[in-house]
């Protein structure tokens, strides 16, 4: 297949570069910017090539960093007994300041969703630090309030360098069908009962890294068959349509009830599709993350 490109001269501080004034064919977009026009002041070929090479290398390094971030987050979909877990993160820039993680040990699953202040590379680098803290603090005998307190103490020690972090930590016992959680300044996850009732999970404490010695409390609940828990970041709530209206918590709760599916992953994807339809092509202004935890509904034999 023959590809045809429309190319024009490009004005830079060095002068004009790009295709010749006499219509000489340029065979690739790369050549458009490395083939100088016959003008008195043009950048050397090596300078332009080096700049492009650096950008390509940076892109590759950022792509590697994204893969590392995904690897540290654990599986995107997980099953433990009759419990289902699904999570997704979409970065407004290459690296996300939002994070969602699953880690499993036997019949226990630690699920975390949080938001690191800022976006891009700096926030992504701090996630790797937090992942290490979660691994060291996330022992089965630690409840979420104790884990949260340890992480807060560490981030406060690193101030003023460390960012503020909001987080929701949930320790799930898939044998006892219980969730023990701590909400550290994060938007409260939504609990959708099978009968249509909804609750917000607010028990916990302040955001992490802001107040040394802050106290955190754990909440506990049982997830019955057919119940669903939806945790989310502010990027979901603050997603705007073309008129500038925010998606908001009320719309998220109504949508979660409306699109709920038999599987956690299907519920998650339907929710994301609802948010995407609402945005109607508007670009992301913030990172977006979503976690869905669901118990299988009871089935009755005929």
Role assignments for model-derived ranges:
Residues 17-20, 25, 211, 221, ...:
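Compositionally biased, intrinsically disordered low-complexity regions
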